[in-house]
Amino acid sequence: MDVDPVNSEMELDNKPTCETVPGLPQKKHYRQRAHSNPHSDHDIEYPLTPDHMDWSKQYGDYAAGRQVEFADIGCGYGGLLMRLSPMFPETLMIGMEIRVKVSDYVNEKIQALRKHHEGAGHYRNIAVLRSNAMKYMPNYFRKGQLSKMFFLFPDPHFKNKKHKWRIITPTLVSEYAYVLREQGLIYTITDVKDLHDWMVKHLNEHPLFERLSDDEMKADPVVAMLYESTEEGQKVTRNDGEKWPAVFRRLPNPPL
């Protein structure tokens, strides 16, 4: 799949936020390893069920009458959330990040952006949670709640014995199918061809997902955001690396 992200409109959308915002955290103070052991999460607090989750802690009164619909899994420094927020201002989006310092950075950046745009109410629809999506996804989201899920430049876990730690596995794909509504979309991108093939294989093999065609991907404005919105994506570009995107649609459940 080769979707060209380089045209004037997409370049504008993909540029990192450059506005001067008082109180923005400095990323150099929040540096952490690029990836984290998904089993090192013993101090994470999570809701017993989605009914126990109080989203007002993340969104304030903006959560009233709304439910989270977009989930960026392993959101890193939150670049995708910042890009999608003005595109879908009425949609609640959550970034899930297991690394403590990184999730703290994203939260402080969101708070600073909200304060700076307080009169206009921008960025109230995005938030971050420190959580392990590999373990606790059904604790946060109800069946069919999400309309979009994002897996951007996930940890490739190169060693064969660690493939079970990859964020796309047969078991996890079934969980994603549970929380994703019919016609919902899973977006993936990586600079590791082996990981791309792995993710495509397991999503293709699941009976509740089908891959979008090239034309469907080109028609989706969100696809352009996958390439450059994240720090990892920008790093791949600087190193002249190749990026492999794929998008999958959640199919209706088969009749009983």
UniProtKB/Swiss-Prot annotation:
One GO biological process term: RNA (guanine-N7)-methylation
Catalysed reactions, as listed in the record: guanosine(46) in tRNA + S-adenosyl-L-methionine = N(7)-methylguanosine(46) in tRNA + S-adenosyl-L-homocysteine
Keywords attached to this entry: Methyltransferase, Nucleus, RNA-binding, S-adenosyl-L-methionine, Transferase, tRNA processing, tRNA-binding
Protein name per Swiss-Prot or TrEMBL: tRNA (guanine-N(7)-)-methyltransferase
Biased composition (Basic residues): 26-36
HAMAP family xref list: tRNA_methyltr_TrmB_euk
Assigned protein family: Belongs to the class I-like SAM-binding methyltransferase superfamily. TrmB family.
Recorded name of the encoding gene: metl-1
Organism: Caenorhabditis briggsae
Keyword Ribosomal protein in record: no
Gene Ontology cellular-component terms listed: nucleus; tRNA methyltransferase complex
Subcellular location: Nucleus
One annotated GO molecular function: tRNA (guanine(46)-N7)-methyltransferase activity
A Pfam family assignment: Methyltransf_4
Coiled-coil spans in chain: none
E.C. designation(s): 2.1.1.33
Top EC class of this enzyme: transferase
Functional summary from the UniProt entry: Catalyzes the formation of N(7)-methylguanine at position 46 (m7G46) in tRNA.
Active site positions: 155
InterPro entries the record matches: SAM-dependent_MTases_sf, Trm8_euk, tRNA_(Gua-N-7)_MeTrfase_Trmb
